[in-house]
Amino acid sequence: MDKDELFLTIGTMIVSDPEILAVEWDALSFVCSIDPGHRQMTGYCYAGDEWEGAPLGDMVFGAMNPLQELQDAMAAETGNRWKQALIHITRPGPEIDIQFEYDDPRRWSPK
């Protein structure tokens, strides 16, 4: 898959997860850390002025696989592997935006 297809796959897996479908949300955000032998994901659901931890169902956490593919593809192009990805999905749409952190492996991690 190319990078655009991987972005679409990641977003589709997240918004199609039954646990995500069961909650009201205007926006979702996920901080994903991928290092050799280690994967971690933290997520939040936003509805109006309210927020709560996002459910990490099988499809949401399964999005780590295409995210790993995306990391590999980007590293093959640039020679540099990112440490974290910040996934932000908003409604209406939904629209997906993914930002990447190459230096600080804890930049977006909960404090």
Where are the regions that the model predicts?
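Contiguous interface-forming segments/domains that mediate binding rather than catalysis
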Residues: 1-111
